[in-house]
């Protein structure tokens, strides 16, 4: 299990690429549960028995068919939520950006965002 360092799939060659997304998401979720003390990012309630991981700043749907989609599964973009907080309406992109800024620092999150290989950046942070 990966517990040290930044949880960025680009830093772990064994998880790089689309073919390893499922394994990487499982590792990322396990590590985030420990780091965030099994608490929901939205409510602070326990997610020990009821946890979903939400990509909040940029989603899979926004990058459908893009070869580098796997790069969005980064700790800065993933949020732990109870099922009832995730469905039917997950937290807004704006809330996720603010939460990530609080957890990791605005400069770090911006550096990650602008390092993604967009043809054109969909929005500014």
What residue spans do the PLM features occupy?
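A boundary/linker detector
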Residues: 1-37, 44-50, 95-125
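Histidine-centered nuclease catalytic patch
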Residues: 42-80, 89, 93-95
């Amino acid at each position: 299990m990966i517990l040290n360092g930044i949880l960025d799939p680009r830093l772990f060659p064994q998880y790089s690429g689309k073919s390893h997304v499922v394994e990487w998401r499982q590792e990322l979720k396990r590590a985030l549960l420990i780091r965030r003390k099994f608490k929901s990012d939205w409510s602070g309630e326990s997610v020990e028995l009821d946890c979903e991981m939400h990509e909040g700043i940029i989603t899979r749907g926004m990058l459908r068919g893009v070869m580098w989609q796997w790069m969005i599964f980064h700790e800065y973009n993933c949020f732990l939520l109870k099922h009832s907080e995730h469905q039917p309406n997950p937290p807004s992109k704006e809330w996720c950006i603010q939460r990530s800024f609080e957890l990791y620092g605005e400069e770090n999150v911006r550096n990650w965002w602008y390092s993604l290989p967009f043809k054109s950046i969909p929005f500014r942070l």
